[in-house]
A protein has these predicted regions:
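Beta-rich catalytic cores
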Residues: 1, 25, 53-55, 76, ...
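A short loop-to-beta-strand structural motif that recurs across blades of beta-propeller domains
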Residues: 28-30, 79-81, 130-132, 181-182
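Beta-propeller blade termini
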Residues: 1-10, 31, 54-64, 105-115, ...
Length: 277
C-alpha cells in the first residue's frame, strides 16, 4: 500500500523499499545495480522481519546522519527503521518514542515544520492525525494539540509544501468520505532554504538527485523523488536552517553523476540551480 524510491546505500542509484499489506509479510528491499536491474536485498537489509500489515511509508533522514531512514504505518503497530548508510536497517521505534499504540495508521510524511533542521513526522489515521516533533536528540514528542492539527477526520494521506510562500511548510491532508484539509503553518521563526533543480544532462526536474545542505549545526539531506505511497510531493526541496543566516554549502549530486557545490548560500530564498552542461 505504499513504497519509497531512494538511494538507500549511497551508491548513486535509486533503490526501492516496498512493504506488503498482508499479515505476517516483510518489507521488501530491492537494490538497484546501476545497470537497469533490481536485486532482492531484503534479508541483508534486515527488513524482512517486519510482520506488519503496512498501509504507508515515509522516507527521510530523521537523524541527520546522511542517509534515508524509513517509517512504516500499519494496523499492527508503526515501525521506524534507521539506516546505517549501507542499506542495512535497525528498528528503533521504541527508543525514539514512536512505539506507542496509534491505531490503524494510514500514511506518514517527514517534514521540518518548525525549521529547526530536524525532520518531524506527521502521521495520518482515522480520527485525529498526529504530529511528532523531532527533539534533535533521537526522540520524538507528540505536539498535535500544541500546534493545532487536531481536527478529526478519516485521513488517508498527506503532502507537505509551502503553499503561501511564507518560508514554512504547510500540510494538505486527503480525507476519505469528507472534506480534505489544508493546515497553514503560521508559527515558524527559523530560517529556511528551498532548492529547485533544473536538469540539463539529467531529467528536467532533477528527479533522482540528492541535495546536501550543510550549516554549522550539521548536514541535511533530501532526495528529489516526486512522491511516495498514495501522494505526489513537490519537487522543490525545503530545508530548515534554524538560526543560521546562510548555508555553508549546498551540494547537488545529479542523476547524470555530475556534482555541483555552491558555497555561502543566503537563507530565506528559493535557490534555483541549473545543472552544468
Amino acid at each position: 500500500h505504499g513504497a519509497c524510491f531512494g538511494d538507500f546505500n549511497g551508491d548513486g542509484h535509486i533503490d526501492l523499499l516496498a512493504p506488503d499489506a498482508a499479515r505476517g509479510s516483510r518489507m521488501n528491499f530491492l537494490l538497484n545495480d546501476g545497470r537497469g536491474r533490481f536485486h532482492d536485498s531484503t534479508r541483508r537489509s534486515k527488513t524482512w522481519h517486519t510482520q506488519a500489515r503496512t498501509h504507508g511509508m515515509a522516507c527521510g533522514d530523521f537523524d541527520n546522519d546522511g542517509d534515508l531512514d524509513a517509517f512504516l504505518t500499519s494496523r499492527d503497530g508503526n515501525l521506524l527503521f534507521a539506516n546505517d548508510g549501507t542499506g542495512v536497517f535497525a528498528e528503533v521505534s521504541e527508543k525514539t518514542g514512536l512505539a506507542q499504540p496509534l491505531g490503524d495508521t494510514k500514511a506518514a510524511a517527514f517534514f521540518d515544520y518548525d525549521n529547526d533542521g530536524d525532520l518531524d513526522l506527521y502521521i495520518v489515521r482515522p480520527g485525529i492525525d498526529l504530529l511528532f516533533r523531532n527533539e534533535g536528540d533521537g526522540t520524538f514528542k507528540d505536539v498535535t494539540e500544541e500546534v493545532g492539527v487536531n481536527d478529526p477526520g478519516d485521513g488517508k494521506s498527506a503532502s507537505c509544501f509551502d503553499y503561501d510562500n511564507d518560508g514554512d511548510l504547510d500540510l494538505y491532508v486527503v480525507v476519505h468520505n469528507g472534506m480534505n484539509r489544508l493546515f497553514r503553518n503560521d508559527g515558524t521563526t527559523g530560517n529556511w532554504l528551498a532548492v529547485k533543480l533544473l536538469g540539463t544532462r539529467s531529467n528536467r526536474d532533477g528527479i533522482g538527485a540528492r541535495i546536501e545542505v550543510r550549516t554549522g549545526s550539521g548536514l541535511q539531506v533530501r532526495e528529489v523523488i516526486g512522491g511516495k505511497g498514495h501522494m505526489q510531493d513537490p519537487l522543490v526541496q525545503f530545508f530548515g536552517l534554524g538560526q543560521a543566516s546562510a548555508a555553508e554549502s549546498v551540494t547537488i549530486r545529479w542523476p547524470s553523476g555530475r556534482v555541483q557545490t555552491l558555497r555561502s548560500v543566503e537563507a530565506n530564498q528559493v535557490l534555483v540551480v541549473e545543472e552544468k552542461a
